[in-house]
From Swiss-Prot:
Protein name: Actin
Superkingdom in the source lineage: Eukaryota
PANTHER family with a match to the protein in the record: ACTIN (PTHR11937)
Function: Actins are highly conserved proteins that are involved in various types of cell motility and are ubiquitously expressed in all eukaryotic cells.
Pfam families noted in UniProt: Actin
Lineage: Eukaryota, Fungi, Dikarya, Ascomycota, Saccharomycotina
Keyword Hydrolase: yes
Amino acid sequence: MDSGEVAALVIDNGSGMCKAGFAGDDAPRAVFPSIVGRPRHQGIMVGMGQKDSYVGDEAQSKRGILTLRYPIEHGIVTNWDDMEKIWHHTFYNELRVAPEEHPVLLTEAPMNPKSNREKMTQIMFETFNVPAFYVSIQAVLSLYSSGRTTGIVLDSGDGVTHVVPIYAGFSLPHAILRIDLAGRDMTDYLMKILSERGYSFSTTAEREIVRDIKEKLCYVALDFEQEMQTAAQSSAIEKSYELPDGQVITIGNERFRAPEALFHPSVLGLEAAGIDQTTYNSIMKCDVDVRKELYGNIVMSGGTTMFPGIAERMQKEITALAPSSMKVKIIAPPERKYSVWIGGSILASLTTFQQMWISKQEYDESGPSIVHHKCF
């Protein structure tokens, strides 16, 4: 991209975190919680210039006096007014850019409803007046960021998990599987099992503490039963965690019991198959000729795949399910928390991509439905 051109903006809107930055960069400039907070009681902070809503980190830091809402549930936008606030915050407060001066690439969940893609397109062109726009499927971007065009992506974030097989750069829609089980459910489950230990976490603010415990101390056991026995016999896996008020709590087998739900959703009362079985099921829905390439390129992506031990466990479980001679390879890049964003940054800066954008002119001529003809 020559210096005369403006950098495109890449925004990966996740259920839990929004990642935003400039195409061509190797990491997002801004990463903040996808939350909008509103004061619980009007006028509680008289004279502090109280706003009627707060977004992202500011909402997080004032969470004690706010009611927090996530406009993206299970990867899908469910509250457009709040979503618009998040985008506004992204452009003006985080990136400090004028959206009417930059092309914008947004990401979407696999199998995002058509009406949602249209609504995103409409808001970008009509509310923010962007000059050009494109929307890409998250898992496909993750695969690009790993330097592949064929593989199967297990993308697990805060609100939803998808298994997406991709061949030569195109996702295979008939074999995409979704599990409504992700980071937020791990956090909820950890809250539940910690309360069984006598620790009480119930408010939205306390939930954030538990999320931190999860991110710092949880891991996936290679052999769950064996790990449970070890935990019962020794205190080797116990860790202590200091709460904001100074109280120190001890966490033992909860460290691996919470993430185990990814492999056995039944512990959460869910009927779904685990991430291992779902990955296998997705591969089996694909043509027999592409399966070998999928088994050899299982790419993990998203924050909920960051648990230590998850790749090894996945390798073990898939190998057990696959035909005995099959080579199974799990790719878990260290930057996988942001691989969707990184893939978007790569895509939006390719010279070949520049003719793919939906321009403002095309939008004005065709309306929001143009997104189905140009973005796939």
